[in-house]
Amino acid sequence: MKEYYQENHRKYYDQTFSIDPTSFLLPLARCLHPGSTILDVGCGSGRDMRWLKDQGFQPEGFERSQGLAGLARAHSGCPVLEGDFEVHDFSGMKMDAILLVGALVHVPHEHFKKVFENILRALKPGGYVLLTLKEGIQDTGISGGRIFYQWLDEYLRKAIDHLNLSVVDFSRQVSKIRKTDVWLGYVLKKQEGLL
C-alpha cells in the first residue's frame, strides 16, 4: 500500500489537484489569523497547500511519496518534507494548525491513536487540526492494495476524547471524486497549556 502513491503519483495528482477544496478548508481557515503556519500531513498533490497559501497562510507539506512531494512543491510553491508520518518525530515543530485531509484513512483503527498523537506533537497549544476521514462501518479495499478504514462519528469522537481536543466544527460531505463516499470533517482545537 505504501508504494501505491509513489507508483501512481501522477495519476493521483491528476485525479485530485483540480478539485476545489474551499468547502472543507474554509472552516479551518476561519479559525486562523493571516500568516498562520500550517502543516499539511499527507499533502498529496499540494492542492490544499496552494489554496491555503493563496489565502495568506504559510503552509508546509509532509509527504511519504517522493513523486507526490515533488509535484506538491512544484504546484504549490511550498516546502515539503518527505517522510513516513507513522514514525516521524514531530516534536520539533510548533505549528498553528495541522491538516489531515484523508491522510489517516489507511491507518488501521488499532493504530489510529498512536499515529494521531504522534502527529499532534507538531501542534502549538491553542492550535487547530482539520481531520477528515471516510464515514462507514466497513473497511473497503480499492485498487492497488489500498485499504480505507472507515469511521462512524460517535466512534471517532470516543477515539479522540482523551486527547484534550475540542470539536469546533463538524461536517459530512459527499466525495467530489466518488459520490458513494461520505467524508467526516472535524476542526479540532488543542486546549491551551497542554502538550
Where are the language model's segments positioned?
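A short acidic, Gly/Pro-enriched loop at the edge of an enzyme's catalytic core
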Residues: 88-98
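A short SAM/SAH-binding and catalytic strip from SAM-dependent methyltransferases
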Residues: 96-111
